[in-house]
Amino acid sequence: MSPSPFAPTIETIDYPFPPKPIPLSDAEKADYKARIKQLLIEKDAVLVAHYYTDPEIQALAEETGGCVSDSLEMARFGRDHPAKTLIVAGVKFMGETAKILSPEKTILMPTLEATCSLDLGCPIDKFNAFCDAHPDHTVVVYANTSAAVKARADWVVTSSIALEIVEHLDSEGKKIIWGPDRHLGSYIAKQTGAEMLMWQGDCIVHDEFKANALRDLKRVYPDAAILVHPESPASVVAMADAVGSTSQLIKAAQTMANERFIVATDRGIFYKMQQAAPGKTLIEAPTGGNGATCKSCAHCPWMAMNGLKAIEASLSDSDKTTHEIFVDEDLRVKALIPLTRMLDFAKTLNMKVKGNA
């Protein structure tokens, strides 16, 4: 489905990429891990990590009784865990989602500078104006958005339940505004037939996957199944043997008979995917330039900021201003409404909501 003529035009945004963390020696890594484990106990804290963080961070979360999952499950785990402090290894909107669900807890992030192109590409002032121009539309936003954008929405969705919710709204004759990921929105529109006004954002990682290069790689590995996250361009999604959220792609690798998979999502997912499918071969899908001219090169630069040194600092720094997440209470209450609406809808379907990027 082509974008609505009323939707904002696609702008090429040159996102300011952060510098990569300085590599640590094995001895330094061991020291930081030991220190983090001790501080988690002392501070009554638990570490939750997103699928797209580096493998050693995911392993540390598991070793210390935390969790590795998508952003909504991270927030729910933190809400239900008895720890008073939640360390969120991910990007800023994930920390905000955790605070929305657990206002009484201290939410810390390794760095508040870890952001997301979907968040940056959907500033609340412009999104408000877009929604105000179409007051008869129901506003549906992806979970990969700021607390302010969530507060403006009627529904918040993850990629695992977006199809069902949009189908439900469409069956009721609702006109829909979708934001911010244009690729995911187009995929949902194609699957459901719903008419949607689409915000024109994208994920810098998934937007770089290229169908022509993927086709060439498939020729090299004809027996490989192609797994694609729906934040990818339509031409890439069209080549997929399985399309789904992070958790759904992990499940596909585990259950499909293929011994080899070409995976079109952030390579951070390989850690949990390999756990779920030991012995199977995982291959990165090609990005723009086959590594020569790609920008993200299949790994989110902001996720990469969640290093051991930064995690230790979030626990040890006496000044928490560069780590602690705050959400205005009025905004939090408003953002909680569409989140709760999604969770309640999921209960009626008897399904567990997982799977935003």
From Swiss-Prot:
GO molecular function annotation: 4 iron, 4 sulfur cluster binding; metal ion binding; quinolinate synthetase A activity
Reaction equations catalysed: iminosuccinate + dihydroxyacetone phosphate = quinolinate + phosphate + 2 H2O + H(+)
Positions bound to [4Fe-4S] cluster: 116, 203, 300
Domain of life, per lineage: Bacteria
Known EC number: 2.5.1.72
Acyltransferase is among the record's keywords: no
Cited Gene3D superfamilies: NadA-like (3.40.50.10800)
Cystines in this chain: none
SUPFAM superfamilies given in the database record: NadA-like
Obligatory cofactor(s): [4Fe-4S] cluster
Associated pathway: Cofactor biosynthesis; NAD(+) biosynthesis; quinolinate from iminoaspartate: step 1/1
Alphabetical list of InterPro entries matching this protein: NadA, NadA_sf, Quinolinate_synth_A_type1
Alphabetic keyword roster: 4Fe-4S, Cytoplasm, Iron, Iron-sulfur, Metal-binding, Pyridine nucleotide biosynthesis, Transferase
GO biological process: 'de novo' NAD biosynthetic process from L-aspartate
Cofactor note: Binds 1 [4Fe-4S] cluster per subunit.
Subcellular location, record wording: Cytoplasm
Annotated residues for binding of iminosuccinate: 50, 71, 142-144, 159, 229-231, 246
GO cellular component, one term: cytosol
Pfam families recorded: NadA
HAMAP family to which the protein is assigned, alphabetical: NadA_type1 (MF_00567)
Similarity comment: Belongs to the quinolinate synthase family. Type 1 subfamily.
Function: Catalyzes the condensation of iminoaspartate with dihydroxyacetone phosphate to form quinolinate.
Listed name of the protein: Quinolinate synthase
Gene: nadA
